[in-house]
């Protein structure tokens, strides 16, 4: 391939832009703490993981053997026997959520899906694409689902097989829906466990909960039927990707034979990026359980540092337990644009990812927010402090 000088100049400018902004994503959960340079040599190959990694595909240039090890790692992490599970490396959390909602719909074709108003916006798209009747449930000030409203709505709809879309770390407030309480509440209205489906959207916190001392319920042992995690968030990847995992006996119900590739396929996208499997494999092979614990503890410590800095001057900042998302009153537009802060309504947040590994990485932002809010901080409040 050969580019003109003008095109080369454009690429070089973009390179400089990326270099300048690599660590400037404090409002979004993207980790920049990764180095996959050892994998650069594989970029010359078109690696396509089309189909089921459990089977040999007629498309030889795949990374199934690496994907298989990645899925074994996550089956252990989320506490389900490897042979009882099936999942794959997706293009991101949204695809994982779609796969799980599709799976749930195939098991319960007449079910309604229930999710809180704090749920990621992708679910609104998914329910329209899959044509699943949906109910959006109120959220508590913390960002958790309103459990009573959930039960009331299910009873009002006379649903015998509801699909529950639970959050393990909401997008804006880092809140986790209590899976055990949901099951207890559903039992109280006469639903057996096999009568409904629980999906866990753990895009960010799926790589937090397994490594903290007192996790919220998050695993298959805790009662979930499927889970979706982003690979480019806590783990880190140059290409967005995700991991979705479900119970194998459920997935087998949607499996189809594809003669074109001489294999089965249960995935949403068909052709899948085989390089992502190499990224995820390299990440899990180069980190021990203790290493991941260290990364998570660092993130949570930096989140607590940020909360304390704000609270010391009277700004009502807070975070949920086991969350590296710090919520505070939204500063003025020049400040949130300068620091790429995500905001919703009257609040904004900072997400302390692994590359924000010390106070010096956060202090300039914290000071800008304090300077912006301090004249008004007595009348600005964030609802939902735990």
UniProtKB/Swiss-Prot annotation:
Keywords: Decarboxylase, Lyase, Plasmid, Pyridoxal phosphate. It catalyses: L-histidine + H(+) = histamine + CO2. The modification N6-(pyridoxal phosphate)lysine is found at residue 233. Its EC number is 4.1.1.22. Pathway: Siderophore biosynthesis; anguibactin biosynthesis. The keyword Nucleotidyltransferase does not apply. Its cofactor is pyridoxal 5'-phosphate. Substrate binds at residue 120. It holds the Pfam family Pyridoxal_deC. It comes from the Bacteria. SUPFAM superfamilies: PLP-dependent transferases. One of its GO terms (biological process) is carboxylic acid metabolic process. InterPro entries: Group_II_Decarboxylase, Hist_deCOase_bac, PyrdxlP-dep_de-COase, PyrdxlP-dep_Trfase, PyrdxlP-dep_Trfase_major, Pyridoxal-P_BS. It is an enzyme of class 4 (lyase). Belongs to the group II decarboxylase family. Homotetramer. HAMAP family: Pyridoxal_decarbox. This is Histidine decarboxylase. It comes from Vibrio anguillarum (strain ATCC 68554 / 775) (Listonella anguillarum).
């Amino acid at each position: 391939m050969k580019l003109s000088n003008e095109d080369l100049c454009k690429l070089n400018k973009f390179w400089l832009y990326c270099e300048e902004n690599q660590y400037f994503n404090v409002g979004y959960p993207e980790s920049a703490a990764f180095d996959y340079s050892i994998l650069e040599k594989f970029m010359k190959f078109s690696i396509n993981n089309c189909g089921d990694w459990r089977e040999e595909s007629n498309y030889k240039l795949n990374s199934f053997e690496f994907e298989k090890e990645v899925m074994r790692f996550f089956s252990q992490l989320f506490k389900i026997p490897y042979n009882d599970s099936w999942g794959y490396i997706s293009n991101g959390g949204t695809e994982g959520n779609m796969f799980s909602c599709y799976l749930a719909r195939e098991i319960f074709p007449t079910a309604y899906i229930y999710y809180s108003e704090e749920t990621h916006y992708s679910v609104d798209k998914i329910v329209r694409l899959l044509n699943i009747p949906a109910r959006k449930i109120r959220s508590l000030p913390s960002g958790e689902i309103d459990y009573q409203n959930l039960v009331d709505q299910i009873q009002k709809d006379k649903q015998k097989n509801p699909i529950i879309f639970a959050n393990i770390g909401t997008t804006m407030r880092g809140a986790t829906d209590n899976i055990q309480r949901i099951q207890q509440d559903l039992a109280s209205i006469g639903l057996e466990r096999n009568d409904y489906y629980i999906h866990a959207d753990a895009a960010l916190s799926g790589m937090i909960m397994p490594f903290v001392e007192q996790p919220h319920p998050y695993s298959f042992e805790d009662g979930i039927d499927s889970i979706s995690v982003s690979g480019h968030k806590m783990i880190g990847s140059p290409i967005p990707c995700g991991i979705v995992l479900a119970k194998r006996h459920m997935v087998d119900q949607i499996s189809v034979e594809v003669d074109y590739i001489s294999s089965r396929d249960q995935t949403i996208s068909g052709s899948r990026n085989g390089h992502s499997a190499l990224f995820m494999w390299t990440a899990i092979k180069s980190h021990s359980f203790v290493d991941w614990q260290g990364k998570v503890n660092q993130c949570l410590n930096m989140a607590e540092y940020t909360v304390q800095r704000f609270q010391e001057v009277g700004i009502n900042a807070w975070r949920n337990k086991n969350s590296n998302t710090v919520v505070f009153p939204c500063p003025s537009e020049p400040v949130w644009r300068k620091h790429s802060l995500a905001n919703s309504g009257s609040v904004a947040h900072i997400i302390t990812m692994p590359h924000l590994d010390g106070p010096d990485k956060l202090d300039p932002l914290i000071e800008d927010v304090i300077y912006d809010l301090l004249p008004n901080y007595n009348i600005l409040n964030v609802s939902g402090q735990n």
